[in-house]
UniProtKB/Swiss-Prot annotation:
It comes from the Eukaryota. This is Cytochrome P450 monooxygenase CLM2. The chain crosses the membrane at residues 2-19. SUPFAM superfamilies: Cytochrome P450. Belongs to the cytochrome P450 family. The gene is CLM2. It is a single-pass membrane protein. It comes from Gibberella zeae (strain ATCC MYA-4620 / CBS 123657 / FGSC 9075 / NRRL 31084 / PH-1) (Wheat head blight fungus).
Length: 529
């Protein structure tokens, strides 16, 4: 009872002292209750946020608002409004929601995803852009993508029941090799892939605005952990440890390899070499070294997460719409022929495959409710005033499923981007906005292309059947925990199209024999969870 009284009194004091903001000029929304605001209007557990907020569009219009403990949350269901607020007004809308839990307690404010817009953010983004943010920069890693996508086919051939794991391993293999020159374990789970996936899971959860009460009531941090409701402290410590290990373990691996002169050229080794040549000695500026480590750590979340979700959606779509797979295979057969797998050099000659990349990003977007921005100043949009400090949340799923923009939007239909329909490219909405657009999007786009093209060329994908031989209809549903979504687990059947395809897949064993994994070279106490 005492704890309840303390919480209520503290909440009231905090609300009256810091969050007594007027609604004048705010976008319309449900009337808030005293003190707690619209807390009852927040998405319930188990309901996808993008679906929950859709009803606000119909009731309150394309730009609406709610507030919790005086904190405004602006809900955007209009593409033009989103691009005005995030692109044209990027000087005022590039902040991130202040996250006491995810930022200060977990430490995720060290990395791009949760950093506030400022000097550190600009330095980090410049580093990433310089290495991977251009077509030429992304193209440097095509050899890695070529090998890892081919190995993905081989894993899928030899062990088709673990396709989802193979998708994650392919994405992790590309990013970790490109970022650190690290080779994943070829035939068993890789501890570094496992570690970074835990980090991404944490980021996905903490970036959801209004997820943790301690973000609104920071004084809860000082309540004894033994009392009810304080379990967030142990969770924060675990995620901080995972983040710190994700930053340090692979970075130290690169330094050790460079000391021996056996490093593979990568994002980290290139930056360290450039700094050494510039400085003429082995002493690194502490700030620059921290920038390298922290930007490297976010690479996986910046590219691999979208790649994994998108490829999983693609596989699901091939079962639900088998005619699409047949049409794509016909294009591959006509353009490439039966004697080789498609490569990056074929992309401009594969318009239908390119459209499949776009449609896979649109159909089940990896971040359907976008990543929240924060208004760093008052923003005026029409007759609305979005006050400084507001959280801005774009419903990306709606932008990509608005029937006024996309014909029959629930259908997976690559033809929508081709003549004569020419529906809008989803690219401008599925990678973020403004100064916070995903810096690894070009690398991720190339990974998605090469995997889709080669799966289409080599495999048939079908619905699974039960023990009685009845077809199992897969569910087209999202996971609901965190900002990052993927299809819920589904049954499937995948098999090589023919004997020639088996030969093409197995050729990688001769062309690129399995590397010995580098896991044993990592500091083991950092990667054992």
């Amino acid at each position: 009872m005492l704890l309840i009284i303390v919480v209520l009194v503290g909440t009231l004091i905090y609300f009256l002292s810091f969050h007594n903001k007027k609604r004048h000029g705010l976008p319309p929304g449900p009337k808030p209750l005293p003190i707690i605001g619209n807390i009852k209007d927040m998405p319930p557990k188990g309901v996808a946020a993008f679906r929950h907020w859709l009803k606000h569009k119909d009731t309150y219009g394309p730009v609406s608002s709610v507030s919790v403990l005086g904190q405004p949350l602006i809900l955007i269901h209009d593409r033009e409004a989103a691009h005005y607020l995030f692109d044209k007004s990027s000087g005022k809308s590039s902040g991130r929601p202040s996250a006491n839990f995810g930022g200060r307690l977990c430490g995720f404010d060290q990395i791009l995803s949760l950093q506030q817009y400022g000097d550190t953010f600009k330095r980090h983004r410049k580093l990433v852009h310089r290495q991977m943010g251009t077509r030429a920069g992304a193209a440097k890693f095509r050899q890695i993508q070529d090998v890892e996508s081919h190995r993905f086919l081989l894993r899928s051939l030899d062990n088709p029941g673990n396709l989802m794991e193979h998708i994650r391993k392919e994405a992790g293999g590309v990013i970790l090799k490109a970022t650190y020159g690290y080779s994943i374990e070829p035939h068993k789970p890789d501890p570094l892939v496992h570690l970074v996936e835990f980090m991404v899971e944490g980021i996905s959860i903490v970036v959801v605005p209004m997820k943790f009460v301690v973000d609104f009531l920071p004084w809860l941090e000082y309540i004894p952990e033994c009392l009810p409701g304080m379990s967030f402290k142990a969770r924060a410590r675990r995620w901080r440890t995972i983040l710190n290990n994700t930053i340090e373990a692979p970075y130290q691996f690169v330094r050790q390899q460079m000391a021996k002169g056996i490093q593979f050229e990568s994002y980290v080794s290139s930056l360290l070499t450039q700094e050494k040549l510039k400085g003429g000695n082995d002493t690194l500026d502490e700030t620059y070294e921290a920038d390298i480590k922290r930007t490297a750590a976010i690479m996986y979340a910046g590219g691999a997460d979208t790649t994994v979700s998108t490829i999983q959606s693609f596989v699901l779509a091939m079962m639900v719409y088998p005619e699409v797979l047949k049409k794509a295979q016909a294009e591959i057969d006509n353009v490439i022929g039966p004697d080789r797998l498609p490569g990056f050099e074929d992309r401009e000659n594969l318009p239908y495959i390119n459209s499949m990349v776009k449609e896979s990003l649109r159909w089940m977007p990896a971040v359907p409710m976008g990543a929240a921005h924060k208004a760093d100043d008052d923003i005026y949009y029409g007759d609305l005033c979005i006050p400084k400090g507001s959280f801005l949340l774009p419903n990306v799923w709606w932008f990509l499923h608005n029937p006024e923009t996309y014909q029959d939007p629930e259908r997976y239909d690559p033809d929508r981007y081709l003549e004569p329909r020419n529906e809008p490219d989803p690219d401008s909405n599925c990678w973020g906005y403004g100064r916070r657009i995903c810096p690894g999007r070009l690398l991720a786009d190339e990974s998605i292309f090469i995997v889709i093209a080669r799966v289409v060329a080599a495999f048939d994908i079908e619905k699974d059947v039960d023990e009685q031989g009845n077809t199992i209809e897969p569910k087209v549903e999202f996971t609901t925990e965190g900002a990052l979504s993927r299809p819920v687990d589904y049954p499937y059947r995948i098999k090589p199209r023919n004997a020639k395809c088996v030969d093409l897949i197995r050729a990688v064993e001769k062309e690129h024999p399995w590397d010995k994994g580098d896991a044993s070279l990592l500091q083991q106490d950092m990667v054992v969870l």
